[in-house]
Amino acid sequence: MKIIYIHGATASERSFAFIQQSIRSAEPIYLNYNKATTAEQNLIDMRKVLDTVQEPFAIIAHSLGGVYATYIQNEYQTTGVVSLATPFGGSELATWGSIFNPHYQLFKDISPSSSFIRNSKKIDIQCPWIQMVTTVGDVPWINGTNDGIVTRSSMMCRRDVEYMEIDRNHYEIVLSQRVVDIIKNIVYK
């Protein structure tokens, strides 16, 4: 089975090295994107890659990658999605960041009031989806319980996914053996 990996905003495909080495799917496909480009253009570019995939696949997505996954999961033969600390409700940190850099495209796209986030919440999830909610790493300048980057309420604002709490912070989750074991269980059912 093919596995599509979609990284988080400040990461790259290398952030999945531990997971990918542990799972060893036949052919990993990485959907990379440019945080300086609009989310809409990134989706166009991702679809060009996915249009070449001729068989069903699972998606593993970290953080912002999970928001992208909401847009593509129902357009292809997606067997399931595992998202790690995805900010379905947007990022309060991006709202703060936009005060200091109002022209940074990533902040515009991931802000809770952005059309990218608002529209993603209107999309029905049509495949099995598990969201790993990170529970460690709280920082005081983000309002509400958070993992150092994303608030718990943002990670848990959808009603059409299954939630599982993981005692890791936003970055450690991609290095967790427990997460790998859960992913294997889901991907190879």
Regions found by a protein language model. Give the residues of each.
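Helical cap/lid subdomain of alpha/beta-hydrolase-fold lipid enzymes
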Residues: 74-189
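Serine-dependent carboxylesterase/thioesterase catalytic core
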Residues: 3-7, 14, 22-126
